[in-house]
Amino acid sequence: MTQSNPNEQNVELNRTSLYWGLLLIFVLAVSFSNYFFN
C-alpha cells in the first residue's frame, strides 16, 4: 500500500505536465499562426 501511493502521484504529475505541455504547444501554435497571417 505504501508503494502504490508514490506511483499514483507520479502518474498525476506526468498527466499535469503533459497537459501543460499540450497547452504550451497550443499557445505557441496560435502565436505562430497569428505571426504568419499578419
UniProtKB/Swiss-Prot annotation:
Name this polypeptide is given: Photosystem II reaction center protein L
Taxonomic lineage: Eukaryota, Viridiplantae, Streptophyta, Embryophyta, Tracheophyta
Gene Ontology CC terms, in alphabetical order: chloroplast thylakoid membrane; photosystem II reaction center
Family designation: Belongs to the PsbL family.
Function according to Swiss-Prot or TrEMBL: One of the components of the core complex of photosystem II (PSII). PSII is a light-driven water:plastoquinone oxidoreductase that uses light energy to abstract electrons from H(2)O, generating O(2) and a proton gradient subsequently used for ATP formation. It consists of a core antenna complex that captures photons, and an electron transfer chain that converts photonic excitation into a charge separation. This subunit is found at the monomer-monomer interface and is required for correct PSII assembly and/or dimerization.
Subcellular location: Plastid, Chloroplast thylakoid membrane
Membrane-spanning intervals of the chain: 17-37
HAMAP family in UniProt: PSII_PsbL (MF_01317)
Subunit description: PSII is composed of 1 copy each of membrane proteins PsbA, PsbB, PsbC, PsbD, PsbE, PsbF, PsbH, PsbI, PsbJ, PsbK, PsbL, PsbM, PsbT, PsbX, PsbY, PsbZ, Psb30/Ycf12, at least 3 peripheral proteins of the oxygen-evolving complex and a large number of cofactors. It forms dimeric complexes.
SUPFAM superfamilies xrefs: Photosystem II reaction center protein L, PsbL
Source domain of life: Eukaryota
Membrane topology summary: Single-pass membrane protein
Disulfides per UniProt: none
GO biological process: photosynthesis
Keywords: Chloroplast, Membrane, Photosynthesis, Photosystem II, Plastid, Reaction center, Thylakoid, Transmembrane, Transmembrane helix
